[in-house]
Structures are given as C-alpha cells and as structure tokens.
Amino acid sequence: MDFTTFHNIIGGKPRGSDNSHSGVDPLTRTTLWPVPTASPQDVDDAVEAAQRALPAWSQASYDERTGLLEKFADLYLSRAGDFCQLLASECGRTVENAAIEVYWAAQWLRYPSSYKLPEEQIEDDTKTAIVTYEPLGVVAAICPWNSIGKIAPALATGNCVILKPSPFTPYTSLKLVELAQEVFPPSVIQVLSGGNGLGPALVKHPGIQKISFTGSTATGKQILKDGADTMKRITLETAGNNPAIILPDIDVTATVPHISGGLWFNAGQVCIAPRRLYIHADIFDVFVDALVETTKEATKEMTKIGPVQNELQFRKLVKTLDDAKSAGHDMATGGPLADAETGGFFLRPTIIKDASPESSIVSGEHFGPIVTCVRFSDADEAVHLANAGESGLAASIWTTNLTAAKALASRLDVGSVYINGPPQPDPRVPFGGHKQSGLGVEYGLQGLLSFCQTKAVYLYK
C-alpha cells in the first residue's frame, strides 16, 4: 500500500475527485499530499453502498464481526511503522508520540471481543418477553483523529460505517479504511474526505441512522439541529475545560512531573487534558514554582511537546494569549509566541498564575498548551470552582487521602474522574461528558449498545 497517494473509499474501491484539498504539516508548515474532496454524489453513492452491504453484515454473528476486527488489528500493527510516520506528519508529533496512539488504536479494535451483546428475558405467568439489541444501520463517524474508537464498536454491533475525518487530518483515516478493505466485505467501512459541506451532508442524509461526533460544542449543537428532521441517533463528545484539584497533602516534588506530562502532551491537544488547576492555598506557591521549572525544562525540546495542529487553531491561541497579556494576567512561564525559528505552529506552554476564576482565560476552553492556576481554601470551594461553567468532560484529583478523593469525585459534575493518575480513557469503561461536554457515551458495553436499537419480543403462553 502506497502511503503517498490518497483516495476516498466508496463501495470497496478507491475514488478520486475533480477537486482536492491538502493538509499541512504543523511541524514545518509545508503542504502535504492532495486528497480528493467528496462530492454530493459521492455521499449518496457511499450511503447506497452501505445500505446494500448492511443485510449480510448485520446478519453475521457477533463473533464473526469481532473476529474480523481482531484480524484487522493484526494487519494494522503489521503496518505500524507506516502509520506512525503518517500520523506524525499530519499532526506534527514525534514518531515516538505517534506510536502511542497507533498501538492504543489496536487495543480499541480488540476491545469488543471481550463482550457479548446481552439478551434479556422477563417472564411471568402469562408471557415471556425477550429483549435484544440490533444494529441501527448506517453510521457516520465524524472526528479529527480518534476514529477507531468509533469504528470498532459500530462494526462489532453490525452497522456499516462511513468515516469522515477532519480536513486538517485526513491522511491516517484514509489509509486506515483503505487497509480495512483487505479484511471487511466491500462497503462495510468507507471513508469520505471533504470540506465544510461534507459533515452537514452526512448529518442530514435520510439514509444514515446515527452520527458519532467528536469536536467542538458549537458544531455538536449544529449537528443536533441538522439531524432533527431525520431523527438521527446522535452521540457527541465535545469540549472539555477540565479541572484538576490538587490537595495540600501531596508530595509536590513527586506529583508535579506526573501532572506536567498530562498538561503538555501533544501540546495540550487532548480532550481530557487538565486546563484549570485548582491548588490548595497552603501549597500554591511551591507547587506553581515547581510546575514552572518542570515546564521550562520540557520546553528545551519543543518538538516533543509538539506544535498546534493547524494554523486556524494556532491563531486563536495566539489571540487568547495576547488578550491575557493585555488583561494583565501573570504568565508564570510561556507567552504569546515561541521563537519564529521553529518554523511550525509552536506555542510555548503557558502557565497563568492566580487567574480570576471568573475571567475568560479560566472559563473558556483553550485547546492547546495553556493552563490556569487558581487557589482554593477548602473542599467546598474546590468543588464549586471545578463545577463552574458548562463543560463536564473529565476531572482529576491529586491527594494521598483516597477517602477524601472519592468524596470529592462524587460531587464533581463530569463524566470521568481520574485520581492520582493521568487522564486516560480505557476502552472497557464508558466515556462521555456531562453538561455541554457531550451526549451519550462511547466505549465499554454501554458504548457498544449506543450503536444498537432495542427490540422486545413478547411470547404469550
């Protein structure tokens, strides 16, 4: 398979287009390979092909489908080196960092094999009711780079999938689906790359039963509106302005490196990365000083932290930092721009000290290497600050007192809480956001069932 030419995959076959677009390597700002731009006819053709493939695929047994996912995981890992290089090019990561995601993705392909779709029976003197879970039909997955987390459960439960990657990061998804044609029947999994009109075309299409989306809250709300006319089933994973609560009993020297790694990995472009640090007043100054020193050391190798993925987001973050500087915020480290000589879309990791909890730099989600530090005096205040705002994706708590940590976790209005460890989803555990950070869950058994519809059959005696 050639990793320098790219096609949409429709009906099991590569398809070009009269129009094309290209991504940009954020490490060097160089233009990458051309990618065909899907047309409205391509959308219709992909949906029709998926509908033709659906009867046979949905009737295959769960074990048959997950067996093919296992086979695909093996095939994918056999090309891991190529995918690491490709992911590094389109996301600006080091190959070592890209490898983390590539091997993570293989585990996501395998996780449905550890489950069975349940069949429930409810019986009384007059009847037996049998509850089963069936495929929804054709699913469109719209996401930037975590597509396997959507593909695996959708295929395992008997749906056909049309993947729509971000126009900024289309390459890995296109090659992933091209490789999948060696394993799955034609049209079971397809991929379309395109511009701003492609997502709405999929959401509004009457032949698609479900949308699974990862991205901004604003786009998620628009998907809900666009999908209303056809009563789409919709799962959303949207913005996360995630809090971390740091209690005074921690060992600062031992804890700061663990927190720092979660802050700056992939330049903070991780949906569950901490963005608001709530630090107990008793250790605030010593903690921030240690975090600043650790961060300064990390910025000596900016390529390991990585660039912002695209110029649009880069410019937004630059403006955010310019505004923060103009507002007089105390930037303990970092600042508006890294040295121009880096060439890529690099920003220095920025720690903003003693920010007002009500300020936009704290309340807004900044998808990049920006972290705010706020003091708190007791648990009630920490919970109040952490729960402020409309996001509720994830939170983390750092303490030696697990009883206190569990009590705090129960009061946080978020979908996932990580105690004394880095925010990192597990494919066996349901993942979803509270408030405006999402709708529904993915992963685990609940995630599998989110790609199903329920049927009850009554047998009268």
Curated annotation (Swiss-Prot):
GO terms for molecular function: oxidoreductase activity, acting on the aldehyde or oxo group of donors, NAD or NADP as acceptor. SUPFAM superfamilies: ALDH-like. It comes from Fusarium sp. Aldehyde dehydrogenase; part of the gene cluster that mediates the biosynthesis of the mycotoxin lucilactaene and the lucilactaene-related compound NG-391 that act as cell cycle inhibitors with potent growth inhibitory activity against malarial parasites, moderate growth inhibitory activity against cancer cells, and no activity against bacteria and fungi. Its EC number is 1.2.1.3. Pfam families: Aldedh. The keyword NAD applies. Keywords: NAD, Oxidoreductase. It catalyses: an aldehyde + NAD(+) + H2O = a carboxylate + NADH + 2 H(+). Belongs to the aldehyde dehydrogenase family. The active site is at 237, 271. Pathway: Mycotoxin biosynthesis. This is Aldehyde dehydrogenase LUC3. It is an enzyme of class 1 (oxidoreductase).
